[in-house]
């Protein structure tokens, strides 16, 4: 079940961290990291008002520093990024998971 979006006013920088719910390895090798970077670039193209200031990818989580221009953009961007990455991750591994990673 999706969580209620947080209010995140535009014009401010936000540190966002996302990890798997069960601590599973999210990024096993270079192609996994590169696949996430492609999804990240695609998401930024979909929400042109969101600026990526910095990012760090770890084996079981990632950190982003994002600067949304408008109110509500951060939630929309993170929802799309999380759901798209999870769907592609499950499809690549032929797992039956639905929703967030680690289910």
Residue ranges with predicted function:
Residues 1-103:
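Short catalytic/metal-binding and nucleic-acid-binding patches
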């Amino acid at each position: 079940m999706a969580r209620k979006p947080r209010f995140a006013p535009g014009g401010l920088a936000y540190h966002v961290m996302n990890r798997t719910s069960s601590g599973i390895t999210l990024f096993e090798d270079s192609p996994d990291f590169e696949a996430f970077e492609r999804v990240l670039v695609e998401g930024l193209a979909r929400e042109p008002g969101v600026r990526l200031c910095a990012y760090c990818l770890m084996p079981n989580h990632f950190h982003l520093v994002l600067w949304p221009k408008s109110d509500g953009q951060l939630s929309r961007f993170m929802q799309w990024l999380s759901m798209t990455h999870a769907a592609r991750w499950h499809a690549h591994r032929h797992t039956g998971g639905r929703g967030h990673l680690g289910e």
